């Protein structure tokens, strides 16, 4: 297995106003976004309840609490933006993984496996009513309830798809004709 190329890039230093410990302690952007959505929905619900409960805003508590929840939701979304702009968290590699071909952290090697193509992969069945204009003249029912056209003769390459499709012949409804 070929070794992955080692990166010689170094992590950028922390911005002057922030330390690395502050960046590590921030919550994930997904958590901030999920909390923001929950608070946003709660704020909208409380605001709508207050808006339709009474028309006097002085004695209507939901009209005060609802917008406060909406401002809190905006704070969560702002935190989501701040958390999503943080750089990658540096991870210390242990000596055990470094010596065993662990590769760079964060990279994944994908390996796809495919099977042989068979006639089953490319077989198509055409379903059409027997009395339609698109059907062939061979639409008379066979010995069974549903009859298939006879199979094509075997060729030298049995796994090549046939050029003509298999046609199902359904019995005709006597009431329709």
UniProtKB/Swiss-Prot annotation:
<feature type="region of interest" description="Disordered">
    <location>
        <begin position="113"/>
        <end position="177"/>
    </location>
</feature>
<feature type="compositionally biased region" description="Low complexity">
    <location>
        <begin position="128"/>
        <end position="161"/>
    </location>
</feature>
<feature type="transmembrane region" description="Helical">
    <location>
        <begin position="63"/>
        <end position="83"/>
    </location>
</feature>
<dbReference type="GO" id="GO:0016020">
    <property type="term" value="C:membrane"/>
</dbReference>
<keyword id="KW-0812">Transmembrane</keyword>
<protein>
    <recommendedName>
        <fullName>Transmembrane protein 275</fullName>
    </recommendedName>
</protein>
<feature type="transmembrane region" description="Helical">
    <location>
        <begin position="36"/>
        <end position="56"/>
    </location>
</feature>
<feature type="region of interest" description="Disordered">
    <location>
        <begin position="1"/>
        <end position="20"/>
    </location>
</feature>
<keyword id="KW-1133">Transmembrane helix</keyword>
<keyword id="KW-0472">Membrane</keyword>
